[in-house]
Amino acid sequence: MIMNKTTLLHEGKAKKVFLTDDADLVIQEFKDDATAFNNKKKGSIADKGVVNNAISCRLFTMLEEHGVNTHLVEKLSDRDMLCRRLDIIKVEVVVRNIAAGSLVRRYGFTEGTVLARPIVEFYLKDDDLDDPLMIAEHAVALGVATMDELEVLKSRAGAINDVLKKFFADRRLKLVDFKLEFGRHKGEILLGDEISPDTCRFWDLDTDEKMDKDRFRFDLGGVEDAYTEVQRRVLELD
């Protein structure tokens, strides 16, 4: 499909979103910019946008095949994804399978502990407030989502986790945790944003080597190689 970018609708940390000639569709352009710690650390990862677009398009397509409705229409180019325009729900949904990151800092888990069951968390999508952890009642009180919508988000996140865990295990990757964003579209709730090493923690199944943005966060080196290896496993091992 030929689709032209018109007006820049939004520019975030990792992507730009453009309006198109069709009011129902937007183009999501993936950037190489990298940030961590709520924008306190900034940098760039070579070809990150190309890698993340490729991974996200493959994963969205695979999730659609498993009955998960997403905003993906099609991959337009190396960096551009054509998407349905969503009314974004200002709730970041985080699913945790293995203790890492803020779960370790906040609750004292030992990093690498496999959780007895996945934990689903809600965070308010607000950079000025550093995306605070919240319970469902907070989201309802703030008017960002209804209780029914939050139940859908939690259920949908669990179903997505089941599909992704198996997909990545088949590719010798542990899905430690990941962030999802959803939006409203014509009365439906669709999965939006991206699924990539920017939004997921991936550890090698055999060595526990970190293969995600933690390599950038904590100056571990080999960031580009890790992203490229995840892309290889996602795309080449079908």
Curated annotation (Swiss-Prot):
Pfam families: SAICAR_synt (PF01259). Keywords: ATP-binding, Ligase, Nucleotide-binding, Purine biosynthesis. It catalyses: 5-amino-1-(5-phospho-D-ribosyl)imidazole-4-carboxylate + L-aspartate + ATP = (2S)-2-[5-amino-1-(5-phospho-beta-D-ribosyl)imidazole-4-carboxamido]succinate + ADP + phosphate + 2 H(+). Signal peptide: none annotated. Its EC number is 6.3.2.6. It is an enzyme of class 6 (ligase). Gene3D superfamilies: ATP-grasp fold, B domain, Phosphorylase Kinase, domain 1. HAMAP family: SAICAR_synth (MF_00137). This is Phosphoribosylaminoimidazole-succinocarboxamide synthase. The gene is purC.
